[in-house]
Every structure is written in C-alpha cells, then in structure tokens.
C-alpha cells in the first residue's frame, strides 16, 4: 500500500 497513516494521541 502507498498509504500514510499518522496517528497522534
């Protein structure tokens, strides 16, 4: 996949 997933909690 070429997705960028950036999760900041």
UniProtKB/Swiss-Prot annotation:
The protein's enzyme class: hydrolase
UniProt keyword list: Glycoprotein, Hydrolase, Secreted
Reactions mediated catalytically: a phosphate monoester + H2O = an alcohol + phosphate
EC numbers for this chain: 3.1.3.2
Modification after translation (UniProt): Glycosylated.
GO MF, one example: acid phosphatase activity
Places the protein is found: Secreted
Gene Ontology CC annotations of this record: extracellular region
Note: In L.esculentum there are at least two isozymes of purple acid phosphatase.
Family the UniProt entry places it in: Belongs to the metallophosphoesterase superfamily. Purple acid phosphatase family.
Quaternary structure and interacting proteins, as annotated: Monomer.
Stated name of the protein: Purple acid phosphatase isozyme LeSAP1
